[in-house]
């Protein structure tokens, strides 16, 4: 499972012009599920997302986690993040999980995040989404389980 984490001052996701998820200060995470992923993979990614220290402390060092700053977490499914881009000029998506598994594990990740962290929003799995964000830094990390 991959999570492309971006520290944001604010972010929202829209489907057909309607806002379906939004956060203020926090993290926007684009999530890709791969064929070998399990609920344990989702649990591991979520632990990292909530505890990865990407926010500045009083001394300006990246020493605080999302949980520490009580920031928002916006989860957006993005199967293209799992693409194989090693050869040719067209991405292959054979390295992405089948849609049923992707949806099951993405939904599981969202529910677990809501149980463990107060401020969680998400996009809509499989929808054509428009994501708006104000990057903070920018600070971006690719997390993999």
Swiss-Prot record:
A motif (Gly-cisPro motif, important for rejection of L-amino acids) lies at residues 137-138. The keyword DNA-binding does not apply. Its main location: cytoplasm. GO terms for cellular component: cytoplasm. Coiled coil: none annotated. The keyword Transferase does not apply. GO terms for biological process: D-amino acid catabolic process. Its EC number is 3.1.1.96. It comes from the Bacteria. It catalyses: glycyl-tRNA(Ala) + H2O = tRNA(Ala) + glycine + H(+); a D-aminoacyl-tRNA + H2O = a tRNA + a D-alpha-amino acid + H(+). PANTHER family: D-AMINOACYL-TRNA DEACYLASE 1, D-TYROSYL-TRNA TYR DEACYLASE. HAMAP family: Deacylase_Dtd. NCBIfam families: D-aminoacyl-tRNA deacylase. Belongs to the DTD family. Homodimer. This is D-aminoacyl-tRNA deacylase. It comes from Pseudomonas fluorescens (strain ATCC BAA-477 / NRRL B-23932 / Pf-5).
